[in-house]
Amino acid sequence: MRPTRWRRSTHVAVGVAVLALVVAVVAAAALFTGKHSDAAEAVPPAPPPATADPGVVPVDLSAPTPTRRGLATALAAALANPDLGLITGRITDADTGAELWEQGARVPMQPASVNKVLTTAAALLTLDRDARLTTTVVAADDQPGLVVLRGGGDTTLSAAPKGTDTWYKGAARISDLADQVRARGIRVTRVRVDTSAYSGPTMAPGWDPADIDGGDIAPMESVMLDGGRTQPTTVESRRSKSPALDAGKALAAALGVEPESVTLMPSGMRGGTTIAEVQSAPLIERLRQMMNESDNVMAESIAREVAEALGRPQSFEGAVGAVLTQLRSVGIDTSGAKLVDSSGLSVDNRLTALTLDEVVNAAAGHTQPALRPLVDLLPIAGGSGTLSNRYLDTDAGRAAAGWLRAKTGSLTGTNALAGIVTDRSGRVLTFALISNNAGPTGRTAIDALAAVLRSCGCGA
């Protein structure tokens, strides 16, 4: 079959149709383009960039300073609370260092754990923030099979298995020491513990032995597990009465040696070959944990680091002397300080509000930049550490929450606070408050006293 032949009229009709289609497409395109152009011209201009008030702003150094009279008037009602017992204190301007209020600031008082402010300050003045403590295992050169766990002052070492939590963040592990020993191919038959880094008594004057079972302290030895806790992740865990021996037993068990055969070497071992070592977390991290939890064992061990750096014995007396020496070296008045430990646990300690406030003021001021981290290490009212559950029960307390930071101190009849607060006018103040012979609501009373500083403009 031949293909169908188009007639001339058919070609003309198709041509006209194509032309009409092209015209329609062009017209539609023009119409669309015109409408799009009109729409573009109708778009409103872009709005100005959004702005927001920053959540954190520098303090206003031009904010009015409270007057002595204004502060005294504002504090009067809170000071009248009989549950404060004997109350001493000092308040100063953080920027100028000017004293704004004081009451018995030079009277020696029982400080409790607020004493840790001094220990922390001395550590910051003396040691590198990244300083670590090393625990080693040494093989005896003349006694095959004998290894010695040599304590270097790390009280945070843990026997917890790998991958499990420990009380202390970044703690070194007994399991790592055991792995290193095995990697050396040494057949271990005996384990001993060298505790010679520390000297003197293991318990300070004024410590109650019952506080070991109460979970507040352990005998101070140069190596221990989880700060001497018998239950490593339990807040109220009782402490061991033989922490160094426990550490040695843990290493022995990890190496397949009978734990009950472990003995101490109080005078240390001469010579030997180091076959394993682990290191603690950096100093700044240990200070943070110590201040947040008010950890007595950590405070004592860190003070002994200061003593070692100054060439003093790592003992209670050596540590206290080293801490006070470093504070005096930067102009802190320690004349009223009579201390027998570095944690504040002893009932025999005496300290003045003047000394405490001078330390905090030096940290908040401009003259001692090495002390500045102390401000960040203070617990936050209503937010962290030993102040996490305080300042939340009253309007005045809630108003101070987040604005006030302080180290706490608590013993029977004693409550203390030393820290920093921004008042209602934006002025930064430092303070130290110590209450002895306090009544049953003494802690609440001292919190209320410090909270006044936040609500106070006190410029008149």
Swiss-Prot record:
Keyword Protease: yes
InterPro entries (alphabetical): Beta-lactam/transpept-like, Peptidase_S13, Rv3627c-like_N
Keyword terms, alphabetized: Carboxypeptidase, Cell wall biogenesis/degradation, Hydrolase, Protease, Signal
Pfam families in the record: Peptidase_S13, Rv3627c_N
GO MF, one example: serine-type carboxypeptidase activity
EC number of this enzyme: 3.4.16.-
Active-site residue list: S113, K116, S294
Recorded superkingdom: Bacteria
Keyword Cell wall biogenesis/degradation: yes
Residues covered by region (Disordered): 39-64
GO terms for biological process, alphabetical: cell wall organization; peptidoglycan metabolic process; proteolysis
Enzyme class: hydrolase
Signal peptide: 1-28
Family under the similarity heading: Belongs to the peptidase S13 family.
Protein name in UniProt: Carboxypeptidase DacB
Organism this protein belongs to: Mycolicibacterium smegmatis (strain ATCC 700084 / mc(2)155)
